[in-house]
Amino acid sequence: MTRLIPAALVAAAFFATAAQAADPVTTPSGLVFQSLKEGTGASPTARDTVRVHYRGYFPDSGKEFDSSIARGQPIDFPLNGVIPCWTEALQKMKAGGKAKLTCPAAIAYGSRGAQGVIPPNATLNFDVELISVKGK
């Protein structure tokens, strides 16, 4: 018999590395990047394909809008095919690393929002783990 673990518990355990957290850094684009765990593998370039676990939520309410953790399946994607916030942030990480991102609307979904889930001009938070960089 398979036991199901509530997604909130999995997410809490998954990102329970705050004790290792570095101070947040704000980049010129407005990205607020906080390393929670330093990775030891390769860092991706914008042209690489990466495998990531993530949880996206609104900073004001904490309401989750998407989570690969809740689905139990990391995602693979070319780094130059996602929102600019992710392209910038994941290049600051190494495989095995975890980080918290705050993405202002200008480098997230902007004035268009996304598919009725993310309103226009929304600032977004993401907890991300860079699992691997394909081919590195």
Which residues are covered by each model-predicted region?
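Cross-family detector of peptidyl-prolyl cis-trans isomerase
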Residues: 2-136
